[in-house]
C-alpha cells in the first residue's frame, strides 16, 4: 500500500527524456524507492543511460538516493555511473555526482 506522503523522483536519460516514479512502500519491506521506479520507467521505454536524478520527499525537499538506489544505478551503468548527477539541494543548486557519493564502489 503506498504511503499517503510519498517521495517522488525524476530521472533524465542520456537522450534528455524525463522519466518519473513514486515511492511504493509496503508493510513487508518489498516496496520500491521513487528513484528506482523512475529508472524502471526509463528502462521500460527502451533507455539504459542516466544523466541526472532528482528526488524529493513529501515536503518537496531534495533527498539523496538510498544505498539500494545507488547500487542499482552503479550496476546499470558500471562504466559510467560516476558521472550521474544527483540534486542534493535545489535551493542552493547543489549537485554532486554518484561518483562523489560512492567513490570506492565494489564494481
Predicted feature residues:
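Disulfide-bonded cysteine motifs in exported proteins
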Residues: 4, 23, 61-64
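Glycine/charged-rich beta-loop-alpha catalytic/anionic-binding loops adjacent to active sites
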Residues: 14-25, 50-53
